[in-house]
Structure formats: structure tokens, C-alpha cells
Amino acid sequence: MKKVIIMAALLISCIFYAQEVQPKYEVVGNEVKATYFHDNGQVKQEGNYLSGKLQGKWISYNENGNKVAIGEYNNGVKVGKWFFWTDDTLNEVDYTGNRVADVRKWSKEALVKN
């Protein structure tokens, strides 16, 4: 009976381990493109590394695949304009030297539709 329980526990742990979504890394030129995933398999985050530091555009998504953040890194430091989406709000955050320099918020109703 002990052997059956041990085998069942081992089998279950193997099944759960196999279902874990592992990050994907791909060498592109002198950078490494990284893609991270939510438990449901949807892309969570994607961007590049250069010399082990975050570099260039990074995009984050929620579990449903909707974009929730986009911004730029330079040598591991947040730079320029970053955009963060929540339910009804778009936040624009300006970074200078990895520090927040300015924040602007727009509600869904304030955005112009064409």
C-alpha cells in the first residue's frame, strides 16, 4: 500500500511539474529575447537582455492577453515614456534616470474616438 501511495504522489508531482510554463530565451544578435508566460500559457512579459540587463522595449500582458504595460529600458534603467493600462485608465509615466519625472492619467471617457 505504501508503494502505491508513493507512486501516486510521484506521478502527480511529475504531472504538475510538466504543466509549469517555462520562460523562453532566444539569442538575437548580441541580445537575448526573453518571453515569460502566465500559468495559463498566455504571454506575461517579453523583452530583451543585453549583458544580463534589461534593454529596449518591454511589454507586459495580463492573463487574458491584454497589454497592461509598455516601456523602455537602457542598460537596466527605465527611460522615457511608459504606459500602463488599467480597467478604464491609461497612465503615462515619464522616467528620467530610473526615477518618475511626470505622471499623466487619462480615463476611458476622456480619450477621443475617431
Q: What label would you give each PLM region?
A:
Residues 1-4, 19:
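Positively charged n-region of N-terminal signal peptides that target proteins for export
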Residues 14-114:
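Glycine/tyrosine- and acidic-biased, solvent-exposed loop/turn segments at the edges of beta-strands
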